[in-house]
Amino acid sequence: MEMETKAGKQKKRSVDSDDDVSKERRPKRAAACTNFKEKSLRISDKSETVEAKKEQILAEEIVAIQLTSSLESNDDPRPNRRLTDFVLHDSEGVPQPVEMLELGDIFIEGVVLPLGDEKKEEKGVRFQSFGRVENWNISGYEDGSPVIWISTALADYDCRKPSKKYKKLYDYFFEKACACVEVFKSLSKNPDTSLDELLAAVSRSMSGSKIFSSGGAIQEFVISQGEFIYNQLAGLDETAKNHETCFVENRVLVSLRDHESNKIHKALSNVALRIDESKVVTSDHLVDGAEDEDVKYAKLIQEEEYRKSMERSRNKRSSTTSGGSSRFYIKISEDEIADDYPLPSYYKNTKEETDELVLFEAGYEVDTRDLPCRTLHNWTLYNSDSRMISLEVLPMRPCAEIDVTVFGSGVVAEDDGSGFCLDDSESSTSTQSNDHDGMNIFLSQIKEWMIEFGAEMIFVTLRTDMAWYRLGKPSKQYAPWFGTVMKTVRVGISIFNMLMRESRVAKLSYANVIKRLCGLEENDKAYISSKLLDVERYVVVHGQIILQLFEEYPDKDIKRCPFVTSLASKMQDIHHTKWIIKKKKKILQKGKNLNPRAGIAPVVSRMKAMQATTTRLVNRIWGEFYSIYSPEVPSEAINAENVEEEELEEVEEEDENEEDDPEENELEAVEIQNSPTPKKIKGISEDMEIKWDGEILGKTSAGEPLYGRAFVGGDVVVVGSAVILEVDDQDDTQLICFVEFMFESSNHSKMLHGKLLQRGSETVLGMAANERELFLTNECLTVQLKDIKGTVSLEIRSRLWGHQYRKENIDVDKLDRARAEERKTNGLPTDYYCKSLYSPERGGFFSLPRNDMGLGSGFCSSCKIRENEEERSKTKLNDSKTGFLSNGIEYHNGDFVYVLPNYITKDGLKKGSRRTTLKCGRNVGLKAFVVCQLLDVIVLEESRKASKASFQVKLTRFYRPEDISEEKAYASDIQELYYSQDTYILPPEAIQGKCEVRKKSDMPLCREYPILDHIFFCEVFYDSSTGYLKQFPANMKLKFSTIKDETLLREKKGKGVETGTSSGMLMKPDEVPKEKPLATLDIFAGCGGLSHGLENAGVSTTKWAIEYEEPAGHAFKQNHPEATVFVDNCNVILRAIMEKCGDVDDCVSTVEAAELAAKLDENQKSTLPLPGQVDFINGGPPCQGFSGMNRFSHGSWSKVQCEMILAFLSFADYFRPKYFLLENVKKFVTYNKGRTFQLTMASLLEMGYQVRFGILEAGTYGVSQPRKRVIIWAASPEEVLPEWPEPMHVFDNPGSKISLPRGLRYDAGCNTKFGAPFRSITVRDTIGDLPPVENGESKINKEYGTTPASWFQKKIRGNMSVLTDHICKGLNELNLIRCKKIPKRPGADWRDLPDENVTLSNGLVEKLRPLALSKTAKNHNEWKGLYGRLDWQGNLPISITDPQPMGKVGMCFHPEQDRIITVRECARSQGFPDSYEFSGTTKHKHRQIGNAVPPPLAFALGRKLKEALYLKSSLQHQS
């Protein structure tokens, strides 16, 4: 007769029966009509809302029941429905509590739905009013969750969700029902329990309710509802069976009903309720008086008053936070905590320190959330007298009028995410003096601090007005002071663990916690004392730290547990000083540091975050921008297009699990989406004289006469000039058009054909562009001369190129800017200039096609490009019908081609199961292109649809090793194919390009990694019907690709020398440029990943490198012994170079940089690179902001000056190399609202470079990890800009598009999710041959033990016989246990840990499953991947500088071994060969690898640079 409410399962309520009664029980109510038959009726959209009329209530309810009928309920004798968004109200429409049904008529307003599963999307019917409600019932006793039913004469309704306006009234009744269910559960288990035990059990069960402020409030509520609960449970006896509990005579239930301290009586004992003018009922009458209607009404009124009093009490209590009111913070008394700290001592430091304000320029109002974050090592805190002081006396919230002044000193470094291990005995009180790379500084006043803790880490952070500082280990001198803080933190975490082990946190009272703390073992880090009073004193006086830990925890049950509320209350009772908590998050950074150390003259450190050394050109461009767009300028005005993308990427941090872009799920990669519609030109209405000036110059291809000059009104328009056009759109500015030619049409209209000139603000440059510079585009248009609004002054600018012309060009440009400023001051029209072509579809700015511009001959290069593209996009048969042309590629019978894998649907194509839900498993199941041979072109009958191809292609298929099995794929060459006799007839659009299939003996002798050519070999036959590989049958002959390269044939015969680049380029090997490799300067070189790849491509030789970190610089030198490596600040090196060349006047640098440059020894100065010696500059300037660790305060110029990007660009400006390459993280594009990205390109364009930008995915070039990199190429106007390398491997990692103005998006590399020439490289391919090592392995050199198995292993191992750097970080005891418990299967992570405790060697008992992760998983994507194992068939995670199971990546456990991945395994994931050496500690080596550019990506870029050099050389030969 009742309804179950278990997850995903519901049982309908039907007429009374013995069977149903046995399953569900509830009080029996008045019988209702049971002879109603259901009828299915389809709900239409128009019927979703039906408005009931009072005179048709019964009829309309019948319609509702019919409309919401389901097939499952057709046979039920009495309808059951679901009710949501409902209100119970009287005849006047006033909402009424459920209990009012006993006094008057109640009606229903809400949405009626079928009773089925809530997860199903079903249409409901809304009614304004129906009923009357006959009775209500409560069920769900056996399930432990109340279900409230209301019944009319026709049906029963399960009340699911009240409307918002009815929620408060209904929630109170629902809590009454919950109390009934909880009492039922408790008495069913133990009918003989005492009343106190019953109240305690119910209080624990209902502790999660939001309407009760404490466990005591729950008990009072249950007592107040004693009579209600008794009546409900007594009603169950009518349907109870003999063996079930009898409630009507249960002594505990009777005692609850009769309890004297009924809350209603106690709260309202003196309240008189006026029922009408003639009768007053007091609270005494409510108990002893007759149960007439007035008394019932009075009871309900009193209960409503009690409900409101509960709500007022709850609101009052909820305003109290840890330690008191949310408005106040209780100050800790230094006297009370003094006994827990050492005797007074003073801070002494012989090292000279630098003022914090030197690093972070003050004077700006900033949001505390925007402050930079750093790490502070070897630190000490002290007051204004230099006496050491506890961090505890500072507030943990931002407070006003703090009367405690705390300063600090330490070694500042970049935030490395370090913290304190809970089980590390030396973490907080280490007496070892560790030397840290960084600068000794003294801090300004510390304003607040906070504690964060995870599974086994503690993070303590403090804030000044300048920055946030995550605390590393304190100094030896200060360690005892910090030891007390850490001990208190451990006490708090111990209490937290105690509570979490309880089934209900409310079970553990404050007194119980204190007792348990007394019982801790002395070797427990949370041990205080065995004496109860001592423990309680310690907990109370240090209570703010403990309360802060609980306050920051996301679980509401923890925040308001009895222990927390009691501790907060005891702290309030101490009556300490209260500080007002500030709500304002913005602070004003003051310019004076009151730290006592400020009186000691600071020494400038070599490790200081030095202001960038720049050329005057770079300084001017960036400085002028920030002087115009000051902090007051809203960011939307800078680059609105990038704001949304930046907000998304702020939290992304190279997340390889980002959602697929719907546009990236298309089979064909498209570079430009959402192309804007052509603008409509607004005609000029006024009459004006238009006439040609001069003779006819020729004719167009259509025979129309051409002219070179025309008079349009008062303006003279000539070919090669620029005109203004009005756009028929109020939101658009005027168009400027470059005149290509003018002609008179056949209808005698005077016409102009030209190309649009775009303002810089309309390009990717945004507001970083020069307002006078226009960019030619390939958008052309034809308009009538009468539509011209006017002309503009336009200079097609050209400057001599080279470092030797810098000064001359600077002087010319300076005069030009002065003239332009004078014209602007005098109100004269702007003089524009143009020196570049902007092509958003190619992602770059290119040299102007000067030879094709303004010829006046009727030729337009843009029209020609468009015609070629249209022709290229066509698919058509050749004349002989034995081949066809598609996407510009000619195909003939016998050609080997790529076919999209989704067109091959036979069982022969093994379909791997996608693991997109697993971290690092997105590539599993993705397929490379299917290689086929074109056998024939089948011409079809003429298609009626012109868009359909009139032919199909017949193909024979080659199988790949991965089509056979994973084992076969692992052990086989990635370029190997198996011939088959399987044939397919497919449409031509299935074909994606051509490749070569050769005999294995005809393969290039030196096959490179990574692969950049399209060559395969085949030597066996695959029988798909049997699944066996065989030798070619004698009667089967395969026609292989012919080798047209005679040089390769000679090399195969031993008569030539292998060039190393013969197989992977578009050029022929004997046509490789004979010029020497480019002399290269690598800045921010790291360990040399970028240089290694470029050198292997044969395009560059790194002669000089600059690296800031000594271990990385040493590694670079080991691997590039011929290079001159400067381990120094690049600002100092640039200053020294400009001094050496006598260009100090053009150098903007600090005194510090000048002094350090002067200190360089003569040997260093003699080896400095000079302008004219450097052909190529490359590097990846570090900026912590690009990766989310530091953000400028509204882009203030003072802080921008410290960015290394300025120095990097200044190297390019001063040296003017032929080529320049910038590499950085993906977020570089959107960082700082895109301004840094835009200003970088604007600076290069100002220098005269051509510029190309894009985002590439390293995984598509042969590494087993997702690693997107922003690439900016710059080439001198005399060179050819390199094209983007073609992605060669399948890889599913979307998000490589760059947003451009006008709704455009540029994608440099096509998405290979749907196919590529080769499969993705797996974890097993990468590290499967490496020998097993134990946790914490530290032996540098060892034997391989096995031969390489996979193609990748053979390439990456090379000729190495000794394995180096197969070492790993050690896991602590708890994490090692967790690692061993993580199942060795794909996707396993912390969620697979058993929910149990483990005892550590020190006797501590810890949760195996990290509690912090369990409680917050729902809000953090389940913390997917933390403590995760790698998948042999998946990819490795993003290579980071410090792999750890709780880090940003988290998935760092070996697939089969219980350890973190090693240094060598990380290096392989980046594509470093085993011969590559790293330097320093294990942490240094991980950092070098994590910061490096993957060499395969650099190799691919280098090969495209080599092609560009070849193209220039060939063009020069042609001319």
UniProtKB/Swiss-Prot annotation:
Q: Which gene encodes it?
A: MET4
Please indicate if the UniProt record lists Transferase as a keyword: yes
* Domain SAM-dependent MTase C5-type residue range list: 1078-1512
Q: Name one GO biological process term.
A: DNA methylation-dependent constitutive heterochromatin formation
**Which InterPro entries did the record assign?**
BAH_dom, BAH_sf, C5-Methyltransferase, C5_DNA_meth_AS, C5_MeTfrase, C5_meth_CS, Cytosine_MeTrfase1_RFD, DNMT1-like
- Belongs to which family? Belongs to the class I-like SAM-binding methyltransferase superfamily. C5-methyltransferase family.
* The organism of origin for this protein: Arabidopsis thaliana
Cite the location of the cross-link Glycyl lysine isopeptide (Lys-Gly) (interchain with G-Cter in ubiquitin) from the record. Answer: 583
| Assigned keywords, A-Z | Chromatin regulator, DNA-binding, Isopeptide bond, Methyltransferase, Nucleus, Repeat, S-adenosyl-L-methionine, Transferase, Ubl conjugation
> Known catalysed reaction(s)?
a 2'-deoxycytidine in DNA + S-adenosyl-L-methionine = a 5-methyl-2'-deoxycytidine in DNA + S-adenosyl-L-homocysteine + H(+)
Listed name of the protein: DNA (cytosine-5)-methyltransferase 4
Q: What is its EC number?
A: 2.1.1.37
Write out the GO cellular component annotations. nucleus
NCBIfam families assigned to the protein according to its UniProt record, in alphabetical order? dcm (TIGR00675)
